[in-house]
Amino acid sequence: KLTPTGEFLSPRNRPHINICSRSVPGLSSLRPSSPRVFFSLSVSSNRTRFRSTMASIVEEAKRAAGKAAVDNHYPKDAKYVGIGSGSTIVYVVEAIKDLGIDTSVTKYVPTGSQSKQLIVSAGLTAIDFDALPQGTVLDIAFDGADEVDDELNLIKGGGACLFQEKIVALQAKEFICVADSRKLQSRLLSNWKYIPIEVAPIAAARVLTALTLLGSIDPAVRMQPDAKTVPLRTDQNFYIVDAPFASLLTKADVLIGQDGSGKAGVWEVEALSQAIKQIPGVLDVGIFSGLTGPQAQALGGIGGQKPVAAYFGMPDGSVSVRKAAP
């Protein structure tokens, strides 16, 4: 599930959004002339204005990244386009509309129910993944990320759509990631603290045990934001397990001699993804790594989990572009 701003907040980071909603204790019983009242109101007001300003900066950064990604990569004669579920994708769709081209012959493939609603609300034609004609390859797919490392490996699944996001990316010639600068880190699990994993409800308890054996610290089934004792369900009617691990090594780290095989809970990105995927009951893992679309095509495949490029909106209004190795 997504928040009104388009981002999922798990129980682990939920307290960070409640600061501005706190009321000042005893405010109604204080006299208007009390210095304490004016001080509290001033601090609260300043905090609110600051947070509002920062939120506005982040949204403008997302808009800039979305526009740049579409301007540089959108095929003008596209027949099928994947549209992801990240909060930045709102601005990707906006940028597609702003191109001013004929989109009547283009079908847009959503990665979830909210993504589909976004497509339809923009006046574009949505087609579900399972309704695609056999053998259809998407011209391109755009999606966001919860975190991106130096090698363009991604963590996704904060919005509980990771399985559909992955199959759409794997069916596209190119996958483009769009995010704001906060999502770019040198290693995965630096700022974003857990890996989302989609699991069969009947196997959830066993998956939690297996994740602990792999080194996860307190993995947990994600609950609904508005019902803390009810597990969140994906569009596939599966659960999401959020599994914290130590920050993940890159291939470059392993090449210089660091051990990412899981000893002492230290993993390299792809090694951990493969280990989790082998757990019975796991549908898919919120780690996107491995080949890009062009790399997969060179080997006879269709698409890849890794984006060919990632666009990051910066606080100053500029856009930073990272490209995957050829």
Each model region followed by its residue ranges:
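Alpha-helix termini
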Residues: 27, 75-78, 99-102, 291-303
